[in-house]
């Protein structure tokens, strides 16, 4: 079993710049980091409901992945991490799909301990832009990277920003609201394809800082993932289950100010040519904060 198989799992099982969390997993956890503290949101009058709209903010996204796989009596573990500096710009007016939106990657800095081949790809990323639409619920759809090859080379940590923004009801959300969504997504990249079906439960409560109102959105979800592809020319299939929790802070004007998400996924990778199955555990954590 080669270390590259770990990266295939990462690319398939991870959502974009969103981690998922769940019960404790056997993978070695990443070193604890300082909890995300949302900065004061910009002054804005409180609205009847919070929803997304035009605006631009620069973010620091810290993403950490810990992956463990077992083959026979051998256990392989790998930790990946990076700090991603990205600017999100939402413009109007919206069309039938959503608001025209770009995510511009200014730079990516690998955490210490990230394997050299991955770190080398990461530092090459400059001015990579994803253009698409932000739908009313917050999904980033119809995304197209400015450099497909470059985007694919860092897909393990970067994803495609589909779930960067917390998912909200289409007509916005008010304090005290609760809602449930079922979301199905398909991700394709290179020789790999995966599908994910998630059930998401969310609640919104009032949040106030420095006299400015906003919302704290708590989410939990369970999901099932399946996929297939080729690793070093050899076919594989995967399936598994995962759980996730997250917290997001939204200003009253709809700006995403901070968030933290954690997930745990247990997968089985089947290698039909070799006739073996490999259990894999992946734990991911993503912290988002606004930069000045």
Predicted regions and their residues:
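Sec-dependent bacterial lipoprotein signal peptides
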Residues: 1-14
